[in-house]
């Protein structure tokens, strides 16, 4: 995959539950703590190294932000770092929360 692919929250939900991709959330720590997708890895400048050590480059990665804009830049960056399959989640956490309100975790873990 030379370019990331945009997917909707339904596709992201399916990939997450089928465990065919991991989800990273790039929002600020306060927004992440107030609510995030269960199982999402909070990807920041400080956690990037750990994420890259813990995941093989052939791991499919879905990137989520607030509304689906910032995730595109982060998705492109992950491709440049060597990840093979990267997706940007259209609509971001805002769309996830609207479509799957019962699937929102709170806190930093």
UniProtKB/Swiss-Prot annotation:
Record's function text: Transferase that catalyzes the transfer of sulfur from thiosulfate to thiophilic acceptors such as cyanide or dithiols. May function in a CysM-independent thiosulfate assimilation pathway by catalyzing the conversion of thiosulfate to sulfite, which can then be used for L-cysteine biosynthesis.
Residue positions of the active site: 65 (cysteine persulfide intermediate)
Main location per the UniProt record: cytoplasm
Descriptive protein name: Thiosulfate sulfurtransferase GlpE
Gene Ontology BP terms: glycerol metabolic process
Reaction equation(s) it catalyzes: thiosulfate + hydrogen cyanide = thiocyanate + sulfite + 2 H(+); thiosulfate + [thioredoxin]-dithiol = [thioredoxin]-disulfide + hydrogen sulfide + sulfite + 2 H(+)
PROSITE patterns, per the entry: RHODANESE_3
Pfam family, one: Rhodanese
Its EC number(s): 2.8.1.1
Entry's family note: Belongs to the GlpE family.
Localization in the cell: Cytoplasm
Top-level enzyme category: transferase
Keywords: Cytoplasm, Transferase
MF GO annotations: thiosulfate-cyanide sulfurtransferase activity
CC per GO annotation: cytoplasm
Gene (UniProt): glpE
Domain Rhodanese: 17-105
């Amino acid at each position: 995959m030379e370019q990331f692919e945009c997917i909707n929250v339904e596709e992201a939900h399916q990939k997450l539950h089928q465990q065919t991709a991991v989800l990273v959330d790039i929002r600020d720590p306060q927004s992440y703590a107030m609510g995030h997708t269960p199982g999402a890895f909070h990807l920041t400048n400080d956690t990037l190294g750990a994420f890259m050590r813990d995941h093989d480059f052939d791991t499919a990665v879905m990137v989520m932000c607030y509304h689906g804009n910032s995730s595109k830049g982060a998705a492109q960056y992950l491709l440049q770092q060597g990840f093979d399959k990267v997706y940007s989640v259209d609509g971001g956490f805002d769309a996830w929360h609207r479509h799957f309100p019962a699937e929102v975790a709170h806190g930093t873990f």
